[in-house]
């Protein structure tokens, strides 16, 4: 009891500052009364509203009386066998109906309510450019009411385990047991250079390629240690002149220099539309592969909508 008495003055003091006033006001209103108000408004009568809500007409009338105490208006005027709303009630209806619709949308577990819900799919900028056009088309075909948001990846495992994002699409490897994944596609690695690079005219000149200046992509995940080791064995003497975690930067740099870089094939296909890039044949490197997967919290599968979205994305690839 003492703690409640201490809280009351705090709420009173803060209510004058803005937002806390909302909670003070809502605490004094039974939100069920707003549902009854909407039922009477929509069905234009107390008896009809009582049937819809499975209540007695007397209970509906008592609720309207409570609303008349809260609001300085009679709200509904008897007209024939029903009631007609006052101008003030019409004004209230605009806001109450929108509020109830928003609540229904937020509580829409089964996806039966035709309002927008936001699904977050985190990616890096480069992976997003590669996969999100395909994902957007697929999701909009099956779930046109969904709104998609694409936040950045900061701490992938934490984002998923703490439900800060719904899905992550990347080539990362998670050790958290709550995070599950499905491989969407597997990509081959390619060696790229700019159009007109002198190396394009040389046939299988391993030594020249090995001695050329290289740009190195630095993936953070530990699961690439094996790939890095094998690439190092293929190019033991390569000269690393530039390193970056950003594959877009690497593509732009290669397109404007004589340096070489190793990137996944699908990124080459995408970037070659933006920059003058070419592939250098290197069969042993082209056999190297990298997986791109969709990652999610395993408890998200309890959500029918999110479960369906995951299936749609998997089928899109």
Swiss-Prot record:
Gene Ontology process terms (BP): regulation of DNA-templated transcription
Molecular function GO terms recorded: DNA binding; DNA-binding transcription factor activity
Residue ranges constituting the HTH lysR-type domain according to the UniProt record: 29-86
Superkingdom classification of source: Bacteria
Pfam families named in the record: HTH_1, LysR_substrate
Keywords of this entry: DNA-binding, Transcription, Transcription regulation
Segments of the chain annotated as binding DNA: 46-65
NCBIfam families: PRK11482.1
Sequence similarity: Belongs to the LysR transcriptional regulatory family.
Name used for this protein in its record: Uncharacterized HTH-type transcriptional regulator YbeF
């Amino acid at each position: 009891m003492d703690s409640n008495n201490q809280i009351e003055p705090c709420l009173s003091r803060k209510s004058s500052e803005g937002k806390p006033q909302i909670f003070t006001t809502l605490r004094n209103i039974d939100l069920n009364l707003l549902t009854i108000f909407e039922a009477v408004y929509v069905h234009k009568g107390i008896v009809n509203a009582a049937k819809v809500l499975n209540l007695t007409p007397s209970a509906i009338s008592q609720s309207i009386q409570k609303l008349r105490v809260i609001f300085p208006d009679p709200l509904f005027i008897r007209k024939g066998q029903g009631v007609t709303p006052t101008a003030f009630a019409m004004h209230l209806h605009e806001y109450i109906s929108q509020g109830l619709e928003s609540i229904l949308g937020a509580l829409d577990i089964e996806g039966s309510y035709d309002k927008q819900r936001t699904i977050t799919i985190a990616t890096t900028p480069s992976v997003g450019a590669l996969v999100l056009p395909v994902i957007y088309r697929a999701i909009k075909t099956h779930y046109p009411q969904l709104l998609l948001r694409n936040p950045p990846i900061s701490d992938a495992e934490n984002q998923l385990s703490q439900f800060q994002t719904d899905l992550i699409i990347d080539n990362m490897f998670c050790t958290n047991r709550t995070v599950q994944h499905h491989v969407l596609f597997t990509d081959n690695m390619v060696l790229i250079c700019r159009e007109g690079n002198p190396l394009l005219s040389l046939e299988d000149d391993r030594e020249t390629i090995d001695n050329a200046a290289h740009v190195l992509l630095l993936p953070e995940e530990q699961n690439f240690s094996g790939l890095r080791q094998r690439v190092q064995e293929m190019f033991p003497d390569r000269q690393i002149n530039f390193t970056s975690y950003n594959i877009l930067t690497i593509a732009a740099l290669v397109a404007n220099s004589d340096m070489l870089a190793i990137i996944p094939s699908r990124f080459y296909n995408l970037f070659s539309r933006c920059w003058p890039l070419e592939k250098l044949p290197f069969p042993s490197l082209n056999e190297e592969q990298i997986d791109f997967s969709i990652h999610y919290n395993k408890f998200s599968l309890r959500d029918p909508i999110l479960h369906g979205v995951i299936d749609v994305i998997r089928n899109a690839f």
